[in-house]
């Protein structure tokens, strides 16, 4: 599961969406350092929002299960909970906060991405 991932995020709450990049690095056991870098358009502006968190990733056969939590600060919506599933080629994560919820869809990038 370690390495680079790329895809999109989508808010089911307000329909915001954009490009999402992710880097997963194993720390120890089932804990992975996770760096997300989300982008979205707000009018003519492109907003870039990077953040880090630890995720728990456990393997169940050929599938992986993801859980985590991150406090993105009051302006970004507060505390977000994450859970999802994946394979070595695709990750689908649901996220939820008090005033937002949606999905992350990630795949392995092409070498040029």
Task: Label every PLM stretch briefly.
Residues 1-113:
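Central antiparallel beta-sheet cores of small beta-barrel/beta-sandwich binding domains
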